[in-house]
A protein has these predicted regions:
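Single conserved hydrophobic/aromatic residue that forms the stacking wall/gate
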Residues: 1-5, 9
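Envelope-exposed proteins and targeting segments
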Residues: 13, 23, 33, 56-60, ...
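Short beta-strand-centered aromatic/proline hotspots
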Residues: 14-18
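A generic structural motif
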Residues: 21, 31, 41-43, 51, ...
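SH3/SH3-like beta-barrel fold
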Residues: 25-29, 37
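Anionic-ligand binding region
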Residues: 46
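Solvent-exposed, non-transmembrane regulatory segments of membrane-associated proteins
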Residues: 50, 68, 78, 88-160
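A membrane-cytosol interface segment of integral membrane proteins
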Residues: 51-86, 141
Length: 160
C-alpha cells in the first residue's frame, strides 16, 4: 500500500504523514513531535494506516453497575450515537454487552466515523455519555472488593 501525506500511521508512535522523500518519511505525532522514519523501516515492518480506507470504527467501552438497568444504558448510548452528526448511519453503530466483569457490566459502543472525525467523536462521546449517564441515574461503578474479617483463636480465648 502506498503512503500519502496526511495518512495517519501507527508503529511505535501514532502520527500524520507530513512528507515522504527518497530516504525517510516524516510523521508528526499528536503531541507535536516530528518523527523521521527511514523508508526501509516503514516498508519492511507492519504499519497500521488508519486513514486509507476513509472510515474508522470508534471502540468505546463503558462500565455500569450490576444494579443498573443495562437496557436503559444501551438505550442512552443509542440515543447519543443517533444524535451525533459525525457518526455515520452506515455501517450502523453497534452497542453490545461485551463482558460481565468482577465489579461491573462492560458495554461496548461501536460507531463508525470518517477517519478525520475519529478524535472529535471519541472525546464528544465520552463527555455525552458521562452527562447522560448522570442524568439518567446510570451508575459507573468503582472497583469493589469484599473483605471478610475473622477473629483468631487467641482473641476468642481471652474473651472467655
Amino acid at each position: 500500500a502506498s503512503s500519502a501525506a496526511s495518512d495517519v500511521y501507527k508503529r511505535q508512535v501514532e502520527g500524520t504523514v507530513e512528507a515522504i522523500n527518497m530516504w525517510y518519511t516524516e510523521l508528526h505525532s499528536y503531541d507535536n513531535k516530528a518523527i523521521f522514519y527511514p523508508n526501509g523501516q516503514i516498508t519492511s515492518k507492519k504499519v497500521t494506516n488508519y486513514t486509507t480506507l476513509g472510515i474508522r470504527r470508534v471502540d468505546m467501552v463503558y462500565t455500569i453497575s450490576y444494579n443498573t438497568d443495562f437496557r436503559k444504558a444501551m438505550e442512552v448510548l443509542k440515543s447519543i450515537t443517533d444524535a451525533h452528526e459525525l457518526i455515520l448511519k452506515e455501517p450502523e453503530p453497534k452497542i453490545r454487552i461485551t463482558e460481565l466483569a468482577e465489579s461491573a457490566v462492560r458495554i461496548t459502543c461501536y460507531p463508525w466515523v470518517k477517519a478525520e472525525d475519529y478524535w472529535t467523536v471519541y472525546f464528544d462521546l465520552n463527555e455525552a455519555v458521562k452527562e447522560q449517564f448522570d442524568r439518567n441515574g446510570i451508575e459507573i461503578p468503582y472497583n469493589q472488593l469484599d473483605v471478610h474479617l475473622k477473629k483468631d483463636n487467641q482473641d476468642a480465648a481471652t474473651k472467655k
